[in-house]
Design a protein with these regions (language model features):
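Outer-membrane beta-barrel biogenesis signature
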Residues: 17-43, 58, 218-237, 250-253
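Short, surface-exposed charged micro-motifs
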Residues: 22, 118, 279
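Outer membrane beta-barrel
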Residues: 29-55, 61-195, 200-217, 236-239, ...
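Short, charged, low-hydrophobicity "junction" segments
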Residues: 16-24, 183-189, 263-265
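Short solvent-exposed loop/turn micro-motifs enriched in small/polar/acidic residues
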Residues: 25, 111-112, 273
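Short Pro/Gly-enriched beta-strand edge/turn motifs at strand-loop
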Residues: 56-58, 261-262
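Detector for outer-membrane/organellar transmembrane beta-barrel domains
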Residues: 202, 212-216, 220-293
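Bacterial Sec-dependent N-terminal signal peptides
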Residues: 1-20
């Protein structure tokens, strides 16, 4: 009897110690703002597991089954502001094998945990200055967060043709062209060798420029970078984007990724790479369309 009473008492104590938070699903595990509004932090972990099965079919029966289970993504994301809501930050860490693989002599043969480490300063009006490691203003499919995909992954085409992340600075601005017509301008100068590089700049720099046109105004909840139309846009919304990227004296096979191109004498081979994107995002009443070139 004593054991039953003790267990019941501990259970009641545990229940009474729980606190009810006003945070809802999708808004982060922790969402904290300092009492004096000097800083804020939101912590939002997420993961994606995947199972794949395949069989050979010879016309009569299925055979040779193969199965694969993986943790496709495992992320820890922190964001908020410091000192002022105009000075924001974002830190995102990757923990899955696909996130951290790619160690080489240029990142001291260490796991590549850091996906994003960037500060974003709204220094005047519609102007923002970004500094650190984050996604470049490239094709819309790549810039859409993996948490906001409609299918389980991005397209196979995107996996080969994108400019991903890099270390550098970005200047961003938006201009009202009349009525609800909005234009956004994004410019970037970065190191050109991808994320988590620690051993200096082996090649030249990478330059990126992107223009986005929203003739019918902004999307609900930044829906132009969210593949599904979960907000069900009542009026048609369209974004047209154009990106130009130039990686001068690139020393990796794909500029930001791939093997470093080593000559037989141990020196690095350098080549100029140019990438051009044109893309569109359209949404209306639950229907969404995304196209890229």
């Amino acid at each position: 009897n004593f054991k039953i009473v003790a267990i019941a008492f501990l259970s009641l104590t545990s229940l009474s110690a729980q606190e009810i938070s006003d945070t809802s699903f999708g808004k982060g595990l922790i969402n904290f703002v300092a009492k004096d509004s000097s800083f804020s932090v939101k912590f939002a972990p997420r993961f994606q597991v995947r199972s794949m099965s395949s069989w050979n079919y010879d016309g009569d029966q299925y055979g040779s089954p193969e199965h694969n289970f993986i943790v496709r993504r495992a992320r820890l994301k922190f964001d908020g502001f410091a000192y002022s809501p105009k000075l924001k930050y974002k830190i995102e860490l990757g923990l899955s094998n696909r996130d951290i693989s790619g160690a080489n002599q240029f990142n001291r043969n260490t796991p590549r945990y850091i996906l994003d480490a960037v500060i974003m300063w709204n220094f005047a009006g519609n102007w923002e200055l970004w500094a650190g490691q984050t996604k470049l203003p490239g094709n819309v499919e790549r810039v859409v967060s993996s948490a906001n995909l409609q299918l389980i992954d991005r397209s196979l085409l995107n996996s080969r043709f994108n400019i991903d992340r890099d270390l550098g600075i970005q200047l961003r601005h938006k201009t009202n062209l009349g009525g609800s017509f909005l234009m956004r301008e994004k410019f970037s100068v970065s190191q050109g060798e991808g994320r988590n590089v620690t051993e200096g700049n082996e090649g030249g720099l990478q330059y990126t420029a992107r223009l986005e046109f929203l003739p019918f105004g902004t999307f609900k909840s930044k829906g132009d970078y969210f593949q599904s139309d979960l907000k069900r846009e009542e009026k048609p919304k369209l974004m047209l984007g154009f990106t130009y990227n130039y990686n001068q004296n690139a020393v990796r096979e794909r500029g930001f990724a791939g093997d470093y191109m080593m000559r037989t004498d141990g020196s690095l081979y350098e080549t100029d790479q140019t990438t051009i994107f044109a893309d569109a995002m359209f949404k209306h009443n639950g229907f969404s369309f995304m196209g890229e070139y």
